[in-house]
């Protein structure tokens, strides 16, 4: 299975998994998340492949939580140094959307440390 992010056009920013038969929408402004579409919709669009690592299935008692922030490490580091350049930078923290600049410096460092990992 492969993952892709669309980089241009109407579906810009859409992230989906594809197995050759169908595409599963992960994040999108134009498709319902967790829906399945014909992957041919995306053929010919400028996209980048996203590396994914399949993990063995582990039974977890209780809930799970994942915040997805599609950002570059350098962007957040620059936002710490030059907050005036990023007045609208919004990130997900504990299920809530928050302006990065409204966080304390300690909270910003914590977000950066937890957002960028070598693997899941």
Curated annotation (Swiss-Prot):
The modification Glycine radical is found at residue 95. It comes from the Viruses. Gene3D superfamilies: 3.20.70.20. SUPFAM superfamilies: PFL-like glycyl radical enzymes. The keyword Zinc does not apply. Residues 1-120 form the Glycine radical domain. The keyword Lipid metabolism does not apply. Pfam families: Gly_radical. Keywords: Organic radical. GO terms for molecular function: formate C-acetyltransferase activity. Acts as a radical domain for damaged PFL and possibly other radical proteins. This is Autonomous glycyl radical cofactor. It comes from Enterobacteria phage T4. The lineage of its organism: Viruses, Duplodnaviria, Heunggongvirae, Uroviricota, Caudoviricetes.
């Amino acid at each position: 299975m492969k993952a892709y992010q669309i980089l241009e056009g109407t579906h810009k920013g859409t992230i989906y998994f594809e197995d050759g038969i169908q595409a599963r929408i992960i994040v999108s402004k134009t498709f319902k998340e967790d829906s399945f579409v014909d992957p041919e919709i995306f053929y010919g669009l400028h996209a980048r492949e996203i590396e994914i690592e399949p993990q063995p299935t582990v039974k977890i008692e209780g809930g799970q939580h994942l915040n997805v922030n599609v950002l570059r490490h350098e962007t957040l580091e620059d936002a710490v140094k030059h907050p005036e350049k990023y007045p609208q930078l919004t990130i997900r923290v504990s299920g809530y959307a928050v302006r990065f600049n409204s966080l304390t410096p300690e909270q910003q460092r914590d977000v950066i440390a937890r957002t960028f990992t070598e693997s899941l």
